[in-house]
A protein has these predicted regions:
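HIT superfamily nucleotide-processing domains
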Residues: 1-166
Length: 166
């Protein structure tokens, strides 16, 4: 289990009522960037650490422009280009933290967190079966790791270094 309770009610309020957190990061919002360590960005893609990770090695890969549907808002070429980044990030993550299995999924909702993003999550070795799969991602049940900017900077640096060797 992670160390800190996750306030799902506050998260839901921010997700439903607040501005798009991905767009804030893409636009350079200092507060969002302080909370979500950016690993890589260019004109098309944004890669950063999840602010509320359940395990070390929880990364989000997003298109830079605001799109809300995994297939309907992308051309096939745009979609494939983003999936290349998901693959690269997954490989860099596996080289950066102990990983028994890598999870890749798109989560979000038209009711909140609408900006398409892929969760790329390293499942640490040795977790009990019931703590794997959706159990690993259930922040409101599992809890989250305490926010630690120094740890995040170090992890982002390792992932970034491993991205360059791919």
């Amino acid at each position: 289990m992670a160390d800190q309770r996750f306030d799902i009610d506050a998260f839901e309020r921010r997700s439903r009522e607040g501005p798009c957190f991905v767009c804030l990061i893409a636009d350079g919002d200092a507060n969002q960037r302080a909370d979500n360590e950016v690993i890589f960005e260019d004109d098309e893609v944004l890669v950063f650490l999840d602010r509320y990770p359940t395990v070390e090695g929880y990364v989000l890969v997003c298109p830079r422009r605001h799109v809300e549907h995994v297939t309907g808002d992308f051309s096939e070429d745009e979609y494939v280009a983003l999936q290349r980044w998901v693959h690269r990030v997954g490989e860099a993550l596996r080289r950066s933290v102990p990983t028994e299995r890598l999870y890749v999924l798109s989560l979000g909702s038209q009711q909140g967190n609408r900006h398409v993003h892929w969760h790329v999550v390293a499942q640490p070795p040795g977790l009990a079966y019931r703590e794997q799969q959706l159990g690993l991602l259930a922040k409101s049940i599992r809890g989250v790791l305490p926010f630690d900017p120094a740890r995040n900077k170090g992890l982002a640096k390792r992932i970034r270094a491993n991205l360059t060797v791919i």
